[in-house]
Design a protein with these regions (language model features):
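Generic alpha-helical transmembrane segments of integral inner-membrane proteins
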Residues: 1, 27, 106, 110, ...
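Membrane-embedded alpha-helices of multi-pass transport/permease systems
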Residues: 1, 34, 47, 51-54, ...
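Transmembrane-helix boundary motif in ABC transporter permease subunits
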Residues: 1-21, 38, 167-176
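C-terminal transmembrane helix and the adjacent membrane-cytosol boundary/short C-terminal tail
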Residues: 13, 69-80, 84, 90-99, ...
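Transmembrane alpha-helices
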Residues: 27, 64-69, 75-77, 88-119
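Interhelical loop and adjacent transmembrane-helix boundary motif
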Residues: 118-169
Length: 179
């Protein structure tokens, strides 16, 4: 929804919000991690799962918004108007017309955000508290030898990723053959 709002509407402060979206993308992760840690300390939020989630959302949301906004760039909004002319209300139009068109951008952004999040060590290190994330566990185990559970989880993630890529590429191939 943020991407739709930023793409379609003009409002006061839009340029500022757009500029703020680029900050987590362009600043070094260590600076972002220290900044978030400082903010959480100032507002007395104890480090833990909440700070970890807030930090990762802060870090990853721009990638989702940029992906969806790129999808919107080639979107013809006249199909929404046609939907409403045929009797659909705004909510039905959103779920039946807009969302299916934006779904690849949303999915791509979500996968990119997941990949960045699961790979992130630096920000997680600063904000994690008692919660051990997968990358932190891997970094910790490298010092003493990689534990079997880390190897197993890494293998599952790799196999899952390969299967996902093969399935999506197969689906794309089938669509091209049909055309």
């Amino acid at each position: 929804l943020g991407a739709i709002g930023m793409y379609r509407y003009k409002f006061k402060g839009k340029a500022i919000i757009d500029g703020l979206l680029y900050i987590p993308v362009v600043i070094p992760e260590i600076v972002l991690g220290i900044s978030l840690l400082t903010i959480f300390a100032k507002v007395n939020i104890p480090r833990g799962m909440l700070t970890l989630i807030l930090a990762h959302v802060t870090f990853c949301i721009p990638f989702v918004i940029f992906n969806v906004r790129a999808r919107l760039a080639g979107y013809d909004s006249s199909i929404e108007e046609a939907s409403m002319d045929l009797g659909a209300n705004r909510l039905v139009t959103f779920f039946e017309v807009t969302l299916p068109v934006l779904a690849p951008g949303i999915l791509g952004g979500a996968l990119l955000a997941f990949t960045l999040s699961i790979d992130d060590v630096i920000i997680s290190y600063f904000v994690y508290g008692q919660t051990k994330t997968y990358p932190l566990k891997v970094m910790e185990s490298v010092k003493s030898g990689v534990a079997p559970d880390v190897n197993a989880l890494s293998t599952l993630i790799l196999v899952g990723t390969i299967l996902f890529v093969l399935l999506t590429q197969g689906d794309l191939f089938k669509k091209k053959v049909r055309q």
